[in-house]
C-alpha cells in the first residue's frame, strides 16, 4: 500500500497476495474485502440447497461451543441444508499429496513446498517464479470437499466457511468457481449469527448430529502451522516405514519467504533418504 500524488492510499495489486493483513492493520478500518453475505441470503430465500463446508480451525474460533453439534445446529438455523467438516477433504489431500511427493522427490525435484493457503501460494509464485514447479499442485481441502459434495448432490451449492479472506481469492479462480459458490469468514459468520439473534449456547442438538464427520486428527491438524507437511510425512511413513522425510515449516508470509530463500539456495535438506 502506498500514497498516490494526492496522498490517498492505493493498493499495488501487482504485489497484493490477498493475505488480508491490510484489513486488520488499517488504523481507520477503511479497507474491506468483498463479502458474499447478500448472495448467500438470496440463495436461502430461493430455497437453494446450500451446504456449509467448515474449516477445522472453527474449534479455536468458537471456543465457547460445548460441541460441534452446537455449531451444526446454529448453521442449520441460519438456513444451511447440512454441514460438512473440510477436514475430510484434508484427508483426501494428504493421500494425493503423498503420492505426488513420492513420484516427484527426489527424482524430479529436490524438495516440495506445500500449503493450503492461497496467499502463500501466490506469494511463492510471484516472489520465486523459478520455484513454481516445486509447489504442490494438489487441490486444497476446500476444493476436495466441495467437489466430493457436488458429486453426491449435483444440484446443491457450497459455502466454505473459514478464518481467512484469502479463500475468497481461491474460490474466484476459474478452476474453482464452479465448485465453491460462496465464501464466508468466521467473522462474517459470527456477525450473521448475532444479527439473527441465534443463542448458540442454548440451541438443542440432535443426538444423531453431535459430530460433523469422522475426519482424522491429521486432517484437522491442517489448521496448524506445519500441519499439512506433517500429515503428508506421516502418511509416507505409514506406506514406507524406512523412509525419512525432512520437514521445514514456517508461520506467516515473512517466515515462509525466508524459508523459500533458504530452499532456493539449497540450504535446506528436505529430500527423503534413499528407498529400499
Regions found by a protein language model. Give the residues of each.
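Iron-sulfur-cluster electron-transfer modules
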Residues: 1-152
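Glycine-rich beta-alpha junction loops
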Residues: 56, 117, 162-168, 187-190
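Short beta-strand/loop segments at the ligand-binding rim of alpha/beta enzyme cores
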Residues: 155-158
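Internal gly/pro-rich beta-alpha loop/helix module
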Residues: 169-176, 182
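Glycine-rich phosphate-binding loop plus the immediately following alpha-helix
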Residues: 182-203, 225-226
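Acidic/aromatic/glycine-rich contiguous surface patches that form carbohydrate-binding/processing clefts
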Residues: 246-259
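Conserved small/polar residues in nucleotide/adenosyl-binding loops
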Residues: 269-276
Amino acid at each position: 500500500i502506498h500514497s498516490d500524488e494526492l496522498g490517498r492510499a492505493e493498493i499495488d495489486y501487482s504485489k497484493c497476495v490477498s493475505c488480508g493483513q491490510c484489513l486488520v492493520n488499517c488504523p481507520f478500518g477503511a479497507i474491506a474485502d468483498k463479502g458474499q453475505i447478500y448472495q448467500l441470503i438470496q440463495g436461502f430465500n430461493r430455497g437453494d440447497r446450500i451446504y456449509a463446508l467448515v474449516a477445522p480451525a472453527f474449534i479455536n474460533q468458537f471456543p465457547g461451543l460445548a460441541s460441534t453439534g452446537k455449531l451444526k445446529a446454529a448453521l442449520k438455523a441460519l438456513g444451511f441444508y447440512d454441514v460438512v467438516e473440510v477436514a475430510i477433504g484434508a484427508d483426501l489431500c494428504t493421500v494425493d499429496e503423498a503420492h505426488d511427493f513420492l513420484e516427484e522427490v527426489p527424482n524430479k525435484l529436490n524438495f516440495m513446498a506445500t500449503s493450503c493457503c492461497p496467499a502463500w501460494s501466490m506469494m511463492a509464485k510471484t516472489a520465486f517464479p523459478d520455484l513454481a514447479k516445486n509447489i504442490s499442485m494438489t487441490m486444497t481441502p476446500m476444493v476436495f470437499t466441495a467437489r466430493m459434495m457436488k458429486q453426491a448432490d449435483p444440484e446443491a451449492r457450497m459455502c466454505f466457511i473459514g478464518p481467512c479472506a484469502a479463500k475468497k481469492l481461491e474460490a474466484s479462480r476459474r478452476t474453482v468457481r464452479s465448485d465453491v459458490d460462496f465464501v464466508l469468514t468466521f467473522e462474517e459468520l459470527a456477525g450473521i449469527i448475532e444479527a439473527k439473534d441465534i443463542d448458540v449456547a442454548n440451541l438443542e442438538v440432535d443426538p444423531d448430529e453431535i459430530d460433523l464427520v469422522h475426519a482424522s486428527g491429521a486432517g484437522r491438524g491442517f489448521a496448524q502451522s506445519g500441519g499439512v507437511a506433517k500429515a503428508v510425512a506421516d502418511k509416507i511413513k505409514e506406506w514406507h516405514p524406512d523412509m525419512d522425510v525432512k520437514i521445514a515449516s514456517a508461520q506467516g508470509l515473512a517466515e515462509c519467504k525466508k524459508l523459500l530463500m533458504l530452499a532456493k539456495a539449497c540450504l535446506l535438506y528436505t529430500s527423503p533418504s534413499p528407498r529400499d
